[in-house]
Swiss-Prot record:
Compartments where located: Mitochondrion inner membrane
Record protein name field: Mitochondrial import inner membrane translocase subunit tim21
GO biological process: protein import into mitochondrial matrix
InterPro entries xref list: Tim21 (IPR013261), Tim21_IMS_sf (IPR038552)
GO annotations of cellular component type: TIM23 mitochondrial import inner membrane translocase complex
Task performed by this protein: Essential component of the TIM23 complex, a complex that mediates the translocation of transit peptide-containing proteins across the mitochondrial inner membrane. Required to keep the TOM and the TIM23 complexes in close contact. At some point, it is released from the TOM23 complex to allow protein translocation into the mitochondrial matrix.
Biological classification of the source: Eukaryota, Fungi, Dikarya, Ascomycota, Pezizomycotina
Segments in the Mitochondrial intermembrane topological domain: 105-237
Protein transport listed as a keyword: yes
Subunit record text: Component of the TIM23 complex, at least composed of TIM23/timX, TIM17/timQ, tim50 and TIM21/timU.
Family of this protein: Belongs to the TIM21 family.
Transmembrane region(s): 84-104
Length: 237
């Protein structure tokens, strides 16, 4: 057995031993306190800061601020925005009314050209003389000016409107009809008397090539009227 006197000496200076044996908890506590202090300072400064109020303009006003919170310039901006919104609403209402008026006068009104066209087509389909020439009424089609393409048959009907010397309105139109047997042209001439607001037929006829004209409506001239107005070979109107 080795003698204790021969063991290596492990003597450590007293000052160094004291440093090694000193606990490190106080230093960690100091760091924790320092971090907590900095966090408290940061939180305190954030809690005291208030969000910056956005200026109200004509384009950015969303109504979040009350009228009393606005400055003079912002009140002018809000009033301008509300005026513009009102003008947009009025313009939209006027345009909508104009569209409905146009649809009524051009499509749904009994005096419209579309209405009279549909009425004339129905008269052709209901007349036995016309169906004898054209074929089955269920297969009769009516369209505008004839073209080489079947996709262009929905063209506007050729129509003219004018007033005579007495101030009476006249409407003339012609359109094509086609059935399984033949095709033809429908001639329409209507007049609106001064004392009425409805169109009256002066002529409604169907022309089919190779056949006599089929007259569905033709106004009869009042006897003696033409002779009374004709003086020295001149027809007075």
């Amino acid at each position: 057995m080795m003698s204790p006197h021969l063991l290596p000496s492990t003597s450590i200076p007293k000052a160094s031993a004291a440093l090694l044996l000193r606990p490190a908890f106080p230093r960690m506590t100091t760091l924790t306190r320092f971090y907590a202090t900095q966090s408290d300072l940061g939180g305190g400064s954030g809690s005291k800061a208030t969000p910056r109020r956005r200026n109200v303009t004509v384009l950015s006003d969303d109504g979040r601020y009350e009228w009393g919170e606005l400055s003079g310039r912002e009140k002018v901006a809000r009033a301008t925005q509300q005026s513009l919104n009102f003008l947009v609403i009025v313009a939209g209402a006027v345009l909508t009314g104009g569209v409905f008026y146009l649809l009524y006068t051009e499509v749904f009104s009994p005096n419209s050209r579309t209405w009279q066209f549909e009425k004339a087509v129905q008269r052709i389909k209901d007349d036995p003389r016309c169906t004898d020439l054209l074929g089955d009424r269920r297969e009769i089609k009516a369209y505008g000016e004839s073209t080489g393409s079947r996709w262009e048959r929905n063209r506007p009907i050729a129509t003219s409107m004018f007033k005579d010397r007495q101030g009476r309105e006249h409407m003339k139109m012609h359109f094509h009809v086609e059935g399984p047997l033949n095709s033809g042209i429908v001639i329409v001439h209507m007049m609106k008397p001064l004392d009425k607001d409805e169109w009256e037929y002066l002529l409604l006829a169907l022309d089919v090539k190779g056949h006599s004209r089929v007259i569905l409506e033709q106004a009869q001239e009042k006897p003696g009227v033409a002779k009374a107005l004709k003086i020295f070979g001149i027809q007075w109107r």
